[in-house]
């Protein structure tokens, strides 16, 4: 929702050699990954699990944690994804669980206490306002600098020219003392 130029997917990963619930008759455990593409041909697949089995031991068996339906916008500030759980469990029926997600928060930087930097590939900004979707801890923050091709900040648009942003916002404007 809201970024139709980006394709996303949630492939399931099956690890057959793991059998964490010995009483379950079948080997293997599943989780789900996240992948994205801008053209539908070249994909980036993130190998860290995006949907994990969690604390419920009945989900640490094969054929669980499958995303069932595509991403759904369930509120202005929430997206939802349905996954399967309790597959082939003698004491519980198979069911769907709804996961609640932050809009556009799949691949994100974190404004952590220790700080850090991230430099994007060069791009031409064609808009009027630069806006961020971010979430920080109480001690963390986010700042943005506009850089020249040589990596130096454009005067008036460096991190020293803007107050740190902190909090939790889905569409926050970025402003520098050198202009907007």
What is the predicted role of each segment?
Residues 1-180:
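Carbohydrate-active catalytic/glycan-binding domains of CAZyme proteins
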């Amino acid at each position: 929702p809201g970024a139709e130029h980006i394709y996303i997917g949630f492939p399931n990963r099956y690890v057959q050699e793991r059998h964490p619930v010995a009483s379950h008759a079948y080997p293997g455990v599943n989780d789900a990954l996240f992948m994205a593409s801008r053209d539908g041909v070249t994909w980036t697949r993130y190998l860290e699990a995006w949907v994990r089995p969690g604390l419920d031991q009945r989900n640490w068996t094969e054929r669980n944690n499958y995303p069932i339906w595509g991403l759904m916008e369930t509120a202005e500030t929430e997206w939802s994804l349905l996954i399967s759980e309790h597959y082939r469990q003698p004491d519980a029926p198979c069911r769907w669980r709804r996961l609640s997600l932050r809009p556009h928060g799949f691949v994100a930087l974190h404004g952590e206490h220790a700080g850090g930097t991230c430099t994007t590939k060069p791009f031409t900004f064609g808009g009027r306002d630069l806006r961020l979707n971010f979430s920080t801890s109480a001690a963390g923050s986010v700042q943005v600098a506009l850089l020249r091709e040589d990596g130096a900040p454009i005067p008036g648009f460096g991190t020293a020219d803007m107050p740190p942003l902190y909090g939790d916002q889905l569409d926050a404007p970025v402003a520098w003392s050198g202009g907007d």
